[in-house]
Amino acid sequence: PKIRKVLVANRGEIAIRVMRTXKELGIATV
């Protein structure tokens, strides 16, 4: 269960990171 929670948390962090990088890239491209 603990590992599962960590995996879910990591997934959320990765998603946020990807969204942030995409936003930065989008702004930089535009």
UniProtKB/Swiss-Prot annotation:
GO terms for molecular function: ATP binding; propionyl-CoA carboxylase activity. InterPro entries: BC-like_N, Biotin_carboxylation_dom, PreATP-grasp_dom_sf. Optimum pH is 7.0-7.5. One of its GO terms (biological process) is fatty acid biosynthetic process. Gene3D superfamilies: 3.40.50.20. Pfam families: Biotin_carb_N. Its cofactor is Mg(2+); Mn(2+); biotin. Residues 1-30 form the Biotin carboxylation domain. Pathway: Metabolic intermediate metabolism; propanoyl-CoA degradation; succinyl-CoA from propanoyl-CoA: step 1/3. Coiled coil: none annotated. Binds 2 magnesium or manganese ions per subunit. It comes from the Bacteria. It catalyses: propanoyl-CoA + hydrogencarbonate + ATP = (S)-methylmalonyl-CoA + ADP + phosphate + H(+). Its EC number is 6.4.1.3. Optimum temperature is 25-30 degrees Celsius. Keywords: ATP-binding, Biotin, Fatty acid biosynthesis, Fatty acid metabolism, Ligase, Lipid biosynthesis, Lipid metabolism, Nucleotide-binding. Dodecamer composed of six biotin-containing alpha subunits and six beta subunits. Consists of an N-terminal biotin carboxylation/carboxylase (BC) domain that catalyzes the transient carboxylation of the biotin covalently attached to the C-terminal biotinyl-binding/biotin carboxyl carrier (BCC) domain. During development the activity increased gradually with the maximum during the sporulation stage. This is one of the 2 subunits of the biotin-dependent propionyl-CoA carboxylase (PCC), the enzyme catalyzing the carboxylation of propionyl-CoA/propanoyl-CoA to D-methylmalonyl-CoA/(S)-methylmalonyl-CoA. Within the holoenzyme, the alpha subunit catalyzes the ATP-dependent carboxylation of the biotin carried by the biotin carboxyl carrier (BCC) domain, while the beta subunit then transfers the carboxyl group from carboxylated biotin to propionyl-CoA. Propionyl-CoA carboxylase also carboxylates acetyl-CoA, butyryl-CoA and succinyl-CoA. This is Propionyl-CoA carboxylase alpha chain. It comes from Myxococcus xanthus.
